[in-house]
């Protein structure tokens, strides 16, 4: 078990020490590359995470949830279910809309997934309803990358249909052309259309039916090829007046003749310009608006993209009528800028604190300048590598660099301290640099590679969390590697040129006082260490106690997934009684908007009512509440949410569910709350039996709050029970009945108007102003086989029933989603365990399954892999240390320091009231890499003293501890002060950074105190064990 002796001639550092110009120019090159890389790097909130999710939306106005499920969703699901690489498929079928969300494996390229989805849609086309207005439309959805900006377009003079047309054809297209913009979606649903509202009494009096009118309109408005004439000398293209463009033209359309007199559409219907869907609407601060959500392209710089949009807005506004106003409702870059700025400030603060601690220990300005140059050079040089790896400047990479501040200075400190020691003994600076750098080179390599080894398991973390922290781990590893290079090249070269006996011995009042203080501390430590070495078993029992305590703390500490951030945006869902109408829901959202906008923390509000790809039913509304910047409001987002919910509770007939928008969103569907739990069955009847029972139990749990379910089975249905025998005698088919109902009440899209700029629809419906409710069914007329007009009431009875407002599937089976939040005094781990315990008490049938979804599922996965992740980090470090030391024993001595770090980190988190979440776990893994450096520095010098000076193991480890006490204390304090700004952060994004800082500071404090005493004892214990093992082997060999 021999360690290779370090070279006294400078080793790999010799070339750089002897060639200062070349070394300086090399470092300048690294600096310039880093500066250029910094300017080229995009800025974002979190690393780029491509979450391969595709959403397929099919609209079929007028269709019930049951029809949408059986006629649209099911055929598509059967085709999608055959695709390879599909991880999960969920669907939501509501009145007139089917939304299928396809989540693929992370390893499947999104382009391949798109091709498979398109092929599946093509295969299902023949199975879909023939009168489907438009084929299914698919779009890429990245839940981890929400819109960067939300705009509202309003007008005080123009109707919203014209505003929507203007936004779609002019504003949205211009914004889409901006570099970095990926997708612009519109909400508000006010697309222009010609609406034909039939007068049921008028057409009945004339002996007509709605089907007669529909056939006349579709035949009168066509747009198809007509050919051309090709003569001997010229060619003539054929054209005709087959298109009708305006409501006035449709009014004049002759639909029938009676007694030789024409009957025009205007005689039996109100024909007007209106909206394609009158049951959709969006509002911005209570003013009706068209809302635009702008998403960026993958990899685009979110800051520059948002700046480009803002620069274009004045030009766009000038090109619009004066009554049209474009307003920025939310801009994610405001918080991203603030968060990145705060993190950069914390990085600068960490550098300043580290340099300060260096001066405190070295008490010499030239000696302080050297690491003061090495630290920023290592960090800046990292930016150059980040560019080549397609990384970005985000909260996690900046956190990595902030943490790296304490890491990278370690190498420089160890080199400077060792070289200074030889200079103080009287050697020339150049000789001291060569000797000191050569002697310490192996230690630097050990520190570097053992620390990088800890980060390796992070690269193999699965799912989206692994993708997220890959940039963090690699950025930190690159900074550490560059630091090692700088410490073995630039640092010894600068020591040889800048340090001297005179400068090191030059003292002032502060240096003399601090020197005396350090001498007393070292003397006290020496006395304490001597006593500890005399009582090894007591010390060993303390070490074992820390191991036991760390396990107990791990078991009992509250556990979470990801810190809840305050990004200044709140997503909300407003729920009203089932079967609430659009008008009723619009009125309720106005009442709620009045309450919300009175809150002093609220800056703006966007609300949406109606059924579309994200809103499942008319009795729910979506809200986006944009808060004032953090420095302009008194409370953080959770307090604002609590206050708003209390205020809205006073509005009768509505339930409000709010959750803060997060940079990391794993949920693929719009959710009412932060966490979801699903109940899946083979039939809707089974769900109707068990959902109420489970909900009743869950609502009694103190560990969860805001419990709600998307199971709504009390939607009013007017069931038309047709007497088939009577209908058959009259020559009336079920298709005739369905067509008549669809024409009257389905907002049926019956024709298309083509223009040079866009396409618009003709909508057919009955005018129900004078016959509201079920009375409108009495006006339906059908045509019998002999041409007579038959009232629907003569062949059918109307029954009122209840049915689900939406039918949801998970992997093709019925499912309901239960949403919940976690109260402040409980953790997500508590909530998950309570739900699982409750589920067991119900004794659910075998055909009913439960599963957590979204963030909760990711939490379970992360929690299950955390222990293995830490074990992998320890094993990786053991392997690296074993290779470096050519020993099975010494790595164990070094790794014995780890429980102390775990105890400190977990205690600090509990005292601070923080959960053990993913960020805190990353901090603990980093601690594994940091705290072992104390042992490495002790053992390196102890082994060298035993080998070169013939010291006994006890004397060697004792002298090594005293000799390395100062650099150990310096490096630990440097790492601690590097993490301190993260622990104390209070600005935007502080929730993300604070757990990392808390865990690292706590772990470093406890490990620093304990490992200075436990490591020497364990070193001697294993040394005796090695001698005993050798003697046993030797005895066996002699006996053999």
UniProtKB/Swiss-Prot annotation:
Keywords in alphabetical order: Cell inner membrane, Cell membrane, Membrane, Transmembrane, Transmembrane helix, Transport
Presence of keyword Transmembrane helix: yes
MF annotations from Gene Ontology: xenobiotic transmembrane transporter activity
SUPFAM superfamilies: Multidrug efflux transporter AcrB pore domain, PN1, PN2, PC1 and PC2 subdomains, Multidrug efflux transporter AcrB TolC docking domain, DN and DC subdomains, Multidrug efflux transporter AcrB transmembrane domain
Recorded GO CC terms: plasma membrane
Induction text: The mdtABC operon is transcriptionally activated by BaeR.
Membrane topology: Multi-pass membrane protein
Compartmental location: Cell inner membrane
One Pfam family, short name: ACR_tran
Claim: Membrane is one of the keywords in the record: yes
Subunit relationships: Part of a tripartite efflux system composed of MdtA, MdtB and MdtC. MdtB forms a heteromultimer with MdtC.
General function of this protein: The MdtABC tripartite complex confers resistance against novobiocin and deoxycholate.
Family: Belongs to the resistance-nodulation-cell division (RND) (TC 2.A.6) family. MdtB subfamily.
Protein's name in the database: Multidrug resistance protein MdtB
Lineage, top ranks: Bacteria, Pseudomonadati, Pseudomonadota, Gammaproteobacteria, Enterobacterales
């Amino acid at each position: 078990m021999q360690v290779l002796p370090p070279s006294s001639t400078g080793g790999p550092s010799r070339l750089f020490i002897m060639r200062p110009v070349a070394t300086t120019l090399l470092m300048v090159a690294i600096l310039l590359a880093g500066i250029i890389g910094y300017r080229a790097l995009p800025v974002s909130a979190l690393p780029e995470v491509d979450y391969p999710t595709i959403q397929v939306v099919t609209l079929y106005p007028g269709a019930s949830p049951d029809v949408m499920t059986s006629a649209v969703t099911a055929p598509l699901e059967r085709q999608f279910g055959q695709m390879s690489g599909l991880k999960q498929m969920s669907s939501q079928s509501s009145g007139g809309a089917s939304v299928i969300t396809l989540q693929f494996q992370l390893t499947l390229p999104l382009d391949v997934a798109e091709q498979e989805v398109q092929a599946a849609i093509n295969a299902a086309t023949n199975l879909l309803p023939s009168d489907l207005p438009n084929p299914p439309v698919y779009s890429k959805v990245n839940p981890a990358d929400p819109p960067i900006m939300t705009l509202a377009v309003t007008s005080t003079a123009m109707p919203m249909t014209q505003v929507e047309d203007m936004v779609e054809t002019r504003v949205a297209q211009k914004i889409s052309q901006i570099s970095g913009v990926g997708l612009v979606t519109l909400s508000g649903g006010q697309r222009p259309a010609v609406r034909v509202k039939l007068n049921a009494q008028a057409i009945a009096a004339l002996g007509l039916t709605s089907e007669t009118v529909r056939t006349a309109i579709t035949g009168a408005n066509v747009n198809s090829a007509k050919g051309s004439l090709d003569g001997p000398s010229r060619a003539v293209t054929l054209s005709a007046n087959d298109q009708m463009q305006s409501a006035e033209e449709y009014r004049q359309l002759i639909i029938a003749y009676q007694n030789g007199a024409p009957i025009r559409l205007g005689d039996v219907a109100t024909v007007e310009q209106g909206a394609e869907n009158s049951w959709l609407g969006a509002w911005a601060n209570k003013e009706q608006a068209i809302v635009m959500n702008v998403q960026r392209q993958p990899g685009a710089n979110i800051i520059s993209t948002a700046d480009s949009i803002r620069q274009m807005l004045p030009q766009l506004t000038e090109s619009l009528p004066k009554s049209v106003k474009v307003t920025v409702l939310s801009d994610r870059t405001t918080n991203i800028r603030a968060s990145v700025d705060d993190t950069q400030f914390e990085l600068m603060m960490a550098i300043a604190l580290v340099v300060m601690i260096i001066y405190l220990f070295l008490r010499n300005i030239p000696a302080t300048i050297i690491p003061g140059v090495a630290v920023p050079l290592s960090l800046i040089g990292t930016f150059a590598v980040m560019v080549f790896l397609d990384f970005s400047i985000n909260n996690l990479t900046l956190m990595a660099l902030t943490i790296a501040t304490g890491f990278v200075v370690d190498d420089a400190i160890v080199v400077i301290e060792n070289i200074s020691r030889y200079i103080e003994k009287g050697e020339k600076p150049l000789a001291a640099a060569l000797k000191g750098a050569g002697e310490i080179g192996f230690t630097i390599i050990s520190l570097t590679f053992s620390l990088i080894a800890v980060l390796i398991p992070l690269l193999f973390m699965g799912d989206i969390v692994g993708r997220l922290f890959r940039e963090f781990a690699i950025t930190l590893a690159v900074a550490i590697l560059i630091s090692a290079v700088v410490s073995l090249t630039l640092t010894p070269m600068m020591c040889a040129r800048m340090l001297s006996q005179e400068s090191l011995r030059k003292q002032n009042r502060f240096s003399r006082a601090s020197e005396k203080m350090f001498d007393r501390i070292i003397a006290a430590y020496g006395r304490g260490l001597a006593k500890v070495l005399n009582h090894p078993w007591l010390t060993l029992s303390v070490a074992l106690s820390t191991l036991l305590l760390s396990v107990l703390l791990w078991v009992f500490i509250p556990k979470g997934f990801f810190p809840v951030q305050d990004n200044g945006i709140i997503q909300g869902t407003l729920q009203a009684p089932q079967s609430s109408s659009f008008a009723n829901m619009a009125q309720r959202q106005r009442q709620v908007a009045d309450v919300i906008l009175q809150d002093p923390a609220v800056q703006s509000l966007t609300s949406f009512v109606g059924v579309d790809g994200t809103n499942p039913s008319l009795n729910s509304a979506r809200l986006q509440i944009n808060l004032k910047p953090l420095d302009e409001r008194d409370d953080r987002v959770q307090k604002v949410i609590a206050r708003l919910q209390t205020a809205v509770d006073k509005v009768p007939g509505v339930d409000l569910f709010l959750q803060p928008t997060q940079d990391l969103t794993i949920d693929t569907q719009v959710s009412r709350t932060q966490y979801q739990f699903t109940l899946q069955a083979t039939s809707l009847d089974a769900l109707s039996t068990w959902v109420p029972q489970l909900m009743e139990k869950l609502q009694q749990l103190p560990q969860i709050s805001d419990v709600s379910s998307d199971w709504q089975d009390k939607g009013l249905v007017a069931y038309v029970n047709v007497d088939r025998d009577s209908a058959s005698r009259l020559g009336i088919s079920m298709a005739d009945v369905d067509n008549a109902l669809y024409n009257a009440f389905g907002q049926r899209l019956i024709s298309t108007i083509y223009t040079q700029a866009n396409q618009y629809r003709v909508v057919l419906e009955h005018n129900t102003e004078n016959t509201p409710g079920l009375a409108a069914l009495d006006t339906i007329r059908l045509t019998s086989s002999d041409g007579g007009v038959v009232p629907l009431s003569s062949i059918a009875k109307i029954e009122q029933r209840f049915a689900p407002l939406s039918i949801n599937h998970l992997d093709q089976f019925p499912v309901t989603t239960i949403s919940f939040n976690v109260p402040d005094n409980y953790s997500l781990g508590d909530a998950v365990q309570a739900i699982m315990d409750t589920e067991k008490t119900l004794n659910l049938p075998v055909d009913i399954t439960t599963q957590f979804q979204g963030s909760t599922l990711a939490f379970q996965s992360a929690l299950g892999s955390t222990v293995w992740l830490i074990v992998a980090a320890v094993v990786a470090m053991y392997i690296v240390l074993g290779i470096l030391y050519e020993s099975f024993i010494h790595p164990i001595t070094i790794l014995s320091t780890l429980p102390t770090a775990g105890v400190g980190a977990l205690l600090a988190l509990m005292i601070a009231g923080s959960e053990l979440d993913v960020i805190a776990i990353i901090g603990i893994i980093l601690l594994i890499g940091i705290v072992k450096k104390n042992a490495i520095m002790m053992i390196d010098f102890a082994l060298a003293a035993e080998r070169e000076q013939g010291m006994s193991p006890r004397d060697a480890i004792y002298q090594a501890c005293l000799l390395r006490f100062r650099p150990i204390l310096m490096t630990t304090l440097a790492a601690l002060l590097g993490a301190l700004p993260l622990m104390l952060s209070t600005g935007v994004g502080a929730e993300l950074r604070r757990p990392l800082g808390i865990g690292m500071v706590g772990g470093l404090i406890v490990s620093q105190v304990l490992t200075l005493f436990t490591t020497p004892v364990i070193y001697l214990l294993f040394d005796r064990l090695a001698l005993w093992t050798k003697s046993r082997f030797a005895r066996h060999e002699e006996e053999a």
